[in-house]
């Protein structure tokens, strides 16, 4: 299994798990954030959120509004999209049989869903 390492860990956000958890906690409580820690249960059904992705120092509290809204979701699948910052490789791509490494642990790519999206969209390439 391929593991994709983070490109900006330690710069856009802390590379240490505990430091990152502390910063996330601060972002939720920040005056520009939701102002509270997310609930653990909700009957609200969320279909998607838009979340800024700059360094936490710039957008962390605002991003926490999105995370707050999905915090109690029981969904088993999240489709995370982002830009191709470097213009290298495919315009729209996903990986299969792989994971993304984060300071909080590995996030496994749902290979079956990625392959279904590739088939359905016709523009998704495998990276």
Task: Describe each model-derived feature in a short phrase.
Residues 1-127:
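Active-site histidine-anchored catalytic micro-motif
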């Amino acid at each position: 299994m391929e593991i994709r390492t983070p490109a900006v860990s330690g710069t856009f956000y802390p590379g240490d798990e505990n430091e990152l958890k502390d910063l996330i906690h601060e972002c939720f409580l920040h005056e520009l954030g939701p102002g509270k820690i997310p609930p653990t249960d909700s009957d609200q059904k969320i279909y998607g959120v838009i979340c800024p992705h700059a360094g936490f120092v710039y957008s962390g509290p605002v991003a926490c509004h999105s995370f707050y809204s999905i915090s109690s979701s029981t969904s088993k699948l999240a489709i995370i999209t982002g830009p191709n910052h470097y213009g290298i490789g495919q315009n729209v791509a996903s990986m299969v049989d792989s994971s993304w490494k984060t300071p909080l642990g590995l996030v496994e790519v749902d290979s079956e869903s990625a392959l279904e999206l590739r088939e359905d969209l016709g523009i998704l390439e495998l990276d």
